[in-house]
Amino acid sequence: MNTEATHDQNEALTTGARLRNAREQLGLSQQAVAERLCLKVSTVRDIEEDKAPADLASTFLRGYIRSYARLVHIPEEELLPGLEKQAPLRAAKVAPMQSFSLGKRRKKRDGWLMTFTWLVLFVVIGLSGAWWWQDHKAQQEEITTMADQSSAELNNNQSQSVPLDTSTTTDQAMATTPTSPVDTTATNTQTPAATTAPSPTVDSQQNAVVPPSQANVDTAATPAPAATTTPDGAAPLPTDQAGVTTPAVDPNALVMNFTADCWLEVTDATGKKLFSGMQRKDGNLNLTGQAPYKLKIGAPAAVQIQYQGKPVDLSRFIRTNQVARLTLNAEQSPAQ
């Protein structure tokens, strides 16, 4: 009967009360229990008062109670019903995790990298195209400007009258002047013959008869000096040798052959424009002047240049498709 009464009394006590009674029977204080269990005094007090701290998980609280029971020699099986009430197991709240696998993150990163790479590539291509278009447009404008200038200069040259016939008429006048003294001498020689008459009657008869004979004499005498005589100090013209001799070749001659239409401007050392204008396909140009020559060529691929008998290299202008600006020195060293 006494054993059953004691068992019923123990069941009536809570877990904290039973632990406190056992501690007091052993003569231990809350400080001593806390030191042995490595707990705070407040935690031991909460356990004896059947309080569950909010910041303490139920799993840890059940472990502390079991350690406390072993310390005060109380069987753990007797405390299990009370533990279910004092420290019930609470399901931990687990937040649903987002399924971001490593493969998906890597794929997303690679996608952004590819997008950025394509964007940079498009920007580079766009800038290159814009630069090429501006350079091409500037070259076309420059060629058009130079062509307009050359056409304007040609129009101005055509509008000015060139006295080409003056020299020829002067030469003709110089060629005909030596014959006039011969004619005067011929007439002078005829007049004394007419005046030396013995009597006036004969003179009158001669005046009536002589003019036809004088006309015959004059017509016969006049062509003879023109054909046989030359003025004093005048040298005969070498007409036969003029058609045979050829001018000497200038070592500074500039020879150009054109395979296509090309605009061209050539200036010598004195600043004189030897040529400025458009040359057609299959045309050729031979210029002489004072070296060095300054050349501007609109289409370098359409012209072949020979200077001092050697070809001039225009490959660097052909590769870049630019207007060629170069200077040909006396030693044939083209410089841009």
Swiss-Prot record:
Residues 19-71 form the HTH cro/C1-type domain. Residues 148-245 are annotated as: Disordered. One of its GO terms (molecular function) is DNA binding. GO terms for biological process: regulation of cell shape. Residues 133-336 are periplasmic. The keyword Translocase does not apply. Cytoskeletal protein that is involved in cell-shape control through regulation of the length of the long axis. This is Cytoskeleton protein RodZ. It comes from Escherichia coli O7:K1 (strain IAI39 / ExPEC).
